[in-house]
Amino acid sequence: MLVICGSPSKNPGAKIGIALAAVQEKISGAHHVSRFLELLSLGSYSGKFAGEGSRFAWCCSDEQVVRAYEASELCGFTFTVDADQVLFQLMDETYRETGWKLFNPDLPVLFIGGYEDPCIGGARKFAQAVQTMRRVGYMDTKGKLYPGMRHEILNEREKEKVYHDVKKYIEKKLNI
């Protein structure tokens, strides 16, 4: 069983991101922190929530969670060039419909996400992600979006609903 939470949508700009990260790596090294690549990968996410006063408002609708995220030295850091390059590669490869080695086509897959999560690219792209998994052979794939929630659905005010739904899904699949 696989539960995928807050997955990014297919990104047509991923290949450009890979190339730009490769150039940046040659210029500055793999461990360089590039604000340009951060803007390229995450910059558009905060735009919808600009009036909320935090560049991390896209993560969660709960202000306390966002403040805690900002205050934590373990969160909110900028990726290295190498990490950005891997992120762009994952974005490119994840929704490619060729090259999959299907070991367990009966694997139950559940996509969950916040309806307001800019990372998923909207309900249409979220549905396309679910369909991609079905097209590559994982036929028992379902998706559920949670209204009013953003990227960190497990930290939202109504997170108990998400926990409850995932628990019910697991119990159903395991016949518990």
Question: Where are the predicted features?
Answer:
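Alpha/beta-hydrolase-fold enzymes
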Residues: 1-74
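Soluble, non-transmembrane catalytic domains of enzymes that act on hydrophobic metabolites at membranes
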Residues: 1-9, 71, 99-100, 128, ...
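Short, proline-enriched alpha-helix->beta-strand connector loops that line the catalytic pocket
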Residues: 103-109, 136-139
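Conserved alpha/beta-hydrolase "acid-adjacent" motif
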Residues: 118-128
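Catalytic active-site module of serine/aspartate enzymes centered on a nucleophile-bearing elbow/loop
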Residues: 134-176
